[in-house]
Amino acid sequence: MTDLAARLAANADDIADTLVSLLPRAEIDGVRCAEARLLDAMHYGSEGGKRLRAFLAVETATVFGTDRGHALRVGAALECIHAYSLVHDDLPSMDDDALRRGRPTTHIAFDEATAILAGDALQTMAFTILASDATHENPFIRCELVTCLARASGARGMVGGQMIDIEAEKADSPLSLTEISRLQRMKTGALIEVSCSMGAILGQASAESRRAVEYYARDFGLAFQIRDDLLDAIGDVAAVGKAVAKDADAGKATFVDLLGIDGPIARKLITGCSWG
């Protein structure tokens, strides 16, 4: 295992522990509460994964000398948003996926209505975490964290990107490279970019440092999506942990369609993602 892989795994364990401590529990004094099924689904939908967004936030915050406990809370909030997006993305009305992270998706493991509510609750949980003074003693920093995450995950970010993706499936012609780049910057890249940005905010980084972090994260987000498209095109279910070839079956335009398996633009983006 490389040093990076080891750090990613260690951070994933820390984030998992943080989420367990922050998400509401289904039992109160040993008795399951009336909404226990919802709470079980919240925990289920937020389990597993690489915790990449949390890792980016924690590592960026560490660069700027932030308390790790504060950074882990920000990472947990990001993972709540990411988990909610996956739970909803897997629904029959969206991608209709039955497998996520190597096990049944939340609406399969529970039911569709519970999955919708679990996603809703995970979304609001993210902002509950960020608004707490346990995340940072400075209310202005907490407010900026909330604002940045709301913007990145909303209509001009992740959710807007999902809408463009849905509309693209019904379009008469495939998206251009410019259009698909914008789609993916919103749908996938916005949350990756804000992960780094929130780490810098937590560390009270200078404006210049924040810009540098955001430029890095922007291209990293596109490179990450290119990798995801490659896995969908040439990966296998056992390795990826979810259904593959779904994009091609749905007629979606991807970076692989436009650039090929070894496109030069993809290589440029991937090799350009460095702190230097």
Residue ranges and their predicted role:
Residues M1-A26:
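N-terminal amphipathic/basic leader segments beginning at the initiator methionine
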Residues V20, I28-G276:
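Mg2+-dependent prenyl diphosphate-binding active-site environment of isoprenoid biosynthetic enzymes
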